[in-house]
Amino acid sequence: MCIRDRRDTPRHLFLDEAISSRAYEDLALPIGYQQTISQPYVVAKMTEHLISDERLTAIPLKDTLEIGTGCGYQTYLLSIFSKKVTTIERIKPLQEKAKKTLEELKVKNVNFILDDGNGLDNRKYDAILSAAAPLEVPLNLKERLNIGGKLILPVGDSKQQNLIFIKRISKDKYTEEKLEDVLFVPLLKGVVS
C-alpha cells in the first residue's frame, strides 16, 4: 500500500480548526509550541522508507519507535503499518492533544511516553523515525535497531539538514543513505509541562 494513495488519512483532525482548511496542502503547518506538522510529501516519504521491504504483509512492522509525536499525524500513519508504536514527545500539551485525537480515531496500538528521548531503554525496534533533527545521527538510536531494522531522521543544524535513511545489516554494520535536503525542528533536551 502506497502512503501517497491514503487519501482517507484525516490530516485536518490533527490541526487547530483555524488552519484545518489548509490540511491537504503539501506544506508544513504550525501546531503550537514552535512545532510544526510536516508536509504530507515528507511524512509519506519517511513512512514508505520504513515499510519499503515489507509491503506484502498485512502489518509489516512489529515494533516502531517515533521520536517527536507532535500532533500525532505521523504516529497515526505508523500505527497503520505497525503492530505497536512507542511515541515520545517532550511537550506535554502536544502529547495530550495527540493522544486525544488518536483515541477519537480508535487507535489502540500506540504507547505514549513523555520524555526527550535521550534516555532510551535497551528495547530494540524494527523501525525508528525521528521528527526532530539532531546535529548528527545518535549512536543510541542506531543501537536500538533490530538487525534488518531501519532508522529515518533529519540530521543537521537550523540552516542545513539532510534526511538520512539507515538500515542495520548486522551487529556492527549499517548502511546509510542521504535522501534529500529537509528542514525540521531541532531535537532538544528537556520536558515541557
Functional labels for PLM-detected ranges:
Residues 10, 157-159, 182-183:
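Glycine-rich beta-alpha junction loops
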Residues 7-14:
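Amphipathic alpha-helical segments that form the core helices of the histone-fold
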Residues 23-26, 37-61:
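Conserved alpha-helix/loop element of class I SAM-dependent methyltransferases that forms part
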Residues 163-171, 176-193:
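Substrate-binding/catalytic lobe of Class I Rossmann-like enzymes that use SAM or dcSAM, i.e.
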